[in-house]
Structures are given as structure tokens and as C-alpha cells.
Swiss-Prot record:
The lineage of its organism: Eukaryota, Metazoa, Chordata, Craniata, Vertebrata. It comes from Homo sapiens. 6-hydroxy-FAD binds at residues 18-22, 54, 82, 285. This is Ferroptosis suppressor protein 1. Detected in most normal tissues as two transcripts of 1.8 and 4.0 kb in length, respectively. Highly expressed in heart, moderately in liver and skeletal muscles, and expressed at low levels in placenta, lung, kidney, and pancreas. Both transcripts expressed following p53/TP53 induction. The shorter 1.8 kb transcript seems to be the major transcript in EB1 colon cancer cells. It is found in: Lipid droplet; Cell membrane; Cytoplasm; Mitochondrion membrane. The gene is AIFM2. Interacts with importin subunits KPNA2 and IPO5; this interaction likely mediates the translocation into the nucleus upon oxidative stress.
Length: 373
């Protein structure tokens, strides 16, 4: 797909809604193919959120995790909040009244969740970086820290804190018995638990925080009392929430109401076309495909969507997306980790080499064709 695509002037114009991992992969490919496109995101820079948790504990790391869109995509990037999609007139509607015409649409809106794992705000690059540097200070001030939620974000968060600050007392509270994601091999989930115990993390499993609404999040306090449904009380200085990831459907919910899965993701066919709309593709978290929500999968979806837009214009057969065996790596601080590659267990050495040290930051700078700071 390296060669450029010749199209009739004005016949093809792709709008990509959302500049996460799927969005920048699609935009980079369209740019290389010389296909007219516009990437829209409410931030002015791509957030490499795979490294967001390390940026919350290590001073100076956050600047490596935000990469300017306009430097890479120039006039093919528009900062704005998408408030709706007009399917009849093929327009993406922005807050403030601007309308972006499209012949083809790629929805790559991702998911939302609590800071620091996610950063979902209309923001400048500098303000976003500062938010993480402020978080580092809150962590540094706190002797006792509670992490709520023991999915992949929660276990990685607890490990990052204990790696950077071994003297801090970290308690992880999780409503299930097993840690990390249910799609993972039992042996991987068990090793996650062992790593946390070796690092000295206190685990409260099968307990749910019962006073979450009353708790200040991400802010140091002299004394915070965390209570669970089992009657356990934990005194802490800082509470970090790592649960509640939701599909970000606000941009398209109204236009595609009849095409939504219960999660808010869009129902797609094997070509990643939204049901009933051959010129609209959904990729990444907002596509209802039976795989975990992961950055590298969003990139694979982008390859399919871009190839199929080109193939449809050239009247060639469309490619199908076929999920393979799961690859899932958990970085447990920069020196540790565990996971599985194509369904097979991999230990610390492999995960450390592939993910833990750099958290794929250099890959995103390469995709954006920029040099890291």
C-alpha cells in the first residue's frame, strides 16, 4: 500500500474522528497514499496513554507522551469537539458550527476513563503535560496510596508507584478475586499477583470501595478514610481510580442509534464497516469486535479501514478483519512485567525488553515522524 492512490479530484475525502492510536495510524497511511483527509480531535496533541501511568509517577516523563498533531498532519488536522454527524449531507459537525464534508468516515473515538490512565479534555499540549507533572507531585507527597481497581490499569499503576517509590505503602482494592483482565491466561493473572506481592503492594481482593463518591481523587490529603463493602477501612493520603473505562460514543451516538451495541460501540461487519453504511468505518475501542481494547489492535483496524476505502474506490474486493490469538503485555514498572504473545505465556525478560522500559513511546514518535524530546 506504499504507492499513491490516484482519485478524481473531490471524489474522495476521508474524515477521521478521534486521534488516538487508530486515528493516527489511519491518518499516517492516508497521508502516505496522498488521499485527502481531515483528522479531528479535541486535543492539539496525540496522547500516548499506554505510558500515562508512568507519566504520573516519574518527573519529566509526560512530555514524551504528548505529540503535536499539526506538526505531522499540517492542514489535515483540525482541533475541535465533534457534536454530531449529519449522515444525509455527509458532514461531521463541530462545536462552534463548522461542518467537515466527507465521502468516507473513520470513527476512532476510543474510550474515556478516569485520569491519570486517560486524559479526555479539550486541552493544549502544555496544559496536558502540566496535569501529569502535578500528579507526580501528589504521588511524591503521599506516604500512603490507595489504587481502586485491579484490572490492567490498576495493577500497572500500583507497580509503577512501588517501582519508583519503594518506601510508599500502596494498597490495591479490587472487587474480583483474580487481578488483571479476564481474557488473560490464568498463569499470567497469577504472576501479576505474585509480582505485586513481591513489590510489597497490599491487596484487598473481593472487596468494593463503598464510599467512592465522597473521596477526593488524585489529590494529596493529610487523612482520607477509604471504606469497603466488607467493612474494611484504609487510611491513606491519596486515592487513584483505575476503573470505569467506557466507550466514547458521544460523537456518533445520535446518528447511529440503531447500530449501537449495549456497550456503546458500533456494530460492524467483517470489513469494519458500520452496519448499513458502506462508507463509514469504526476502528479501535468504538468498533464492536470481540477483542480487548488495546492500542496495537486499533492500529490493525486502521490498516483494514484504509485498505478498504482505497479498494472500494478502485472497485476491488474488500479485506476482512480476522482477530488472531491474544497478545497482551503488562508492564509492572520499568524492570518487570508479564503477559502473553499469540496466546502463549511470556515472562519478565521478554516483556521488559518489548514494553516495560519504553512503553512503546518511541513507536508513536516514529508513527508521527517526529523526534522525541
Amino acid at each position: 500500500m506504499g504507492s499513491q492512490v490516484s482519485v478524481e479530484s473531490g471524489a474522495l475525502h476521508v474524515v477521521i474522528v478521534g486521534g488516538g492510536f487508530g486515528g493516527i495510524a489511519a491518518a499516517s497511511q492516508l497521508q502516505a497514499l496522498n488521499v485527502p483527509f481531515m483528522l479531528v480531535d479535541m486535543k492539539d496533541s496525540f496522547h500516548h496513554n499506554v505510558a500515562a501511568l508512568r507519566a504520573s509517577v516519574e518527573t519529566g516523563f509526560a512530555k514524551k507522551t504528548f505529540i503535536s498533531y499539526s506538526v505531522t498532519f499540517k492542514d489535515n488536522f483540525r482541533q475541535g469537539l465533534v457534536v454530531g454527524i449529519d449522515l444525509k449531507n455527509q458532514m461531521v459537525l463541530l462545536q462552534g458550527g463548522e461542518a467537515l464534508p466527507f465521502s468516507h468516515l473513520i470513527l476512532a473515538t476510543g474510550s474515556t476513563g478516569p485520569f491519570p490512565g486517560k486524559f479526555n479534555e479539550v486541552s493544549s499540549q502544555q496544559a496536558a503535560i502540566q496535569a501529569y507533572e502535578d500528579m507526580v507531585r501528589q504521588v511524591q507527597r503521599s506516604r500512603f496510596i490507595v489504587v481502586v481497581g485491579g484490572g490492567s490499569a490498576g495493577v500497572e499503576m500500583a507497580a509503577e508507584i512501588k517501582t519508583e517509590y519503594p518506601e510508599k505503602e500502596v494498597t490495591l482494592i479490587h472487587s474480583q478475586v483474580a487481578l488483571a483482565d479476564k481474557e488473560l491466561l490464568p498463569s499470567v493473572r497469577q504472576e501479576v499477583k505474585e509480582i505485586l506481592l513481591r513489590k510489597g503492594v497490599q491487596l484487598l481482593l473481593s472487596e468494593r470501595v463503598s464510599n467512592l463518591e465522597e473521596l477526593p481523587l488524585n489529590e494529596y490529603r493529610e487523612y482520607i478514610k477509604v471504606q469497603t463493602d466488607k467493612g474494611t477501612e484504609v487510611a491513606t493520603n491519596l486515592v487513584i481510580l483505575c476503573t470505569g473505562i467506557k466507550i466514547n460514543s458521544s460523537a456518533y451516538r445520535k446518528a447511529f442509534e440503531s447500530r449501537l451495541a449495549s456497550s456503546g460501540a458500533l456494530r460492524v461487519n467483517e470489513h469494519l464497516q458500520v452496519e448499513g453504511h458502506s462508507n463509514v468505518y469504526a476502528i479501535g475501542d468504538c468498533a464492536d469486535v470481540r477483542t480487548p481494547k488495546m492500542a496495537y489492535l486499533a492500529g490493525l483496524h486502521a490498516n483494514i479501514a484504509v485498505a478498504n476505502i482505497v479498494n472500494s474506490v478502485k472497485q476491488r474486493p474488500l479485506q476482512a478483519y480476522k482477530p488472531g490469538a491474544l497478545t497482551f503485555l503488562l508492564s509492572m514498572g520499568r524492570n518487570d512485567g508479564v503477559g502473553q504473545i499469540s496466546g502463549f505465556y511470556v515472562g519478565r525478560l521478554m516483556v521488559r525488553l518489548t514494553k516495560s522500559r519504553d512503553l512503546f513511546v518511541s513507536t508513536s514518535w516514529k508513527t508521527m515522524r517526529q523526534s522525541p524530546p
